[in-house]
């Protein structure tokens, strides 16, 4: 799924759209996305100018956006908005820097009454950069 197709599903736009491409998608079950981290990212201006590191919270947001694509492409949730309801067991294990390609793997554990629970793993190559359990609620836009 190319970026233009992602923009048809997610409401996020630059500089907060953190998924460049979806390379695997099983609607309502799982998705794998890519974020190519460049030195031009606006967050590197302040985090940190002489030692650029992608903020962990933005890695988690990128995972959430991939989860949103997996769910918001399901017919009953098209046109709805995924709102964060919680983040559990979040761990950061590797620094993400300009030039890295972030692989964002998300599996949907459950969808009940509009509450989505998912697990995400962000990797650079084969190294795990971050893991998290995500919860979000599907709401009307």
Curated annotation (Swiss-Prot):
The active site is at 47. It comes from the Bacteria. It is found in: Cytoplasm. It is an enzyme of class 4 (lyase). Gene3D superfamilies: Hotdog Thioesterase. One of its GO terms (cellular component) is cytoplasm. GO terms for molecular function: (3R)-hydroxyacyl-[acyl-carrier-protein] dehydratase activity. It catalyses: a (3R)-hydroxyacyl-[ACP] = a (2E)-enoyl-[ACP] + H2O. Pfam families: FabA (PF07977). Its EC number is 4.2.1.59. Keywords: Cytoplasm, Lipid A biosynthesis, Lipid biosynthesis, Lipid metabolism, Lyase. One of its GO terms (biological process) is fatty acid biosynthetic process. Belongs to the thioester dehydratase family. FabZ subfamily. Involved in unsaturated fatty acids biosynthesis. Catalyzes the dehydration of short chain beta-hydroxyacyl-ACPs and long chain saturated and unsaturated beta-hydroxyacyl-ACPs. PANTHER family: 3-HYDROXYACYL-[ACYL-CARRIER-PROTEIN] DEHYDRATASE. This is 3-hydroxyacyl-[acyl-carrier-protein] dehydratase FabZ. It comes from Caldanaerobacter subterraneus subsp. tengcongensis (strain DSM 15242 / JCM 11007 / NBRC 100824 / MB4). The gene is fabZ.
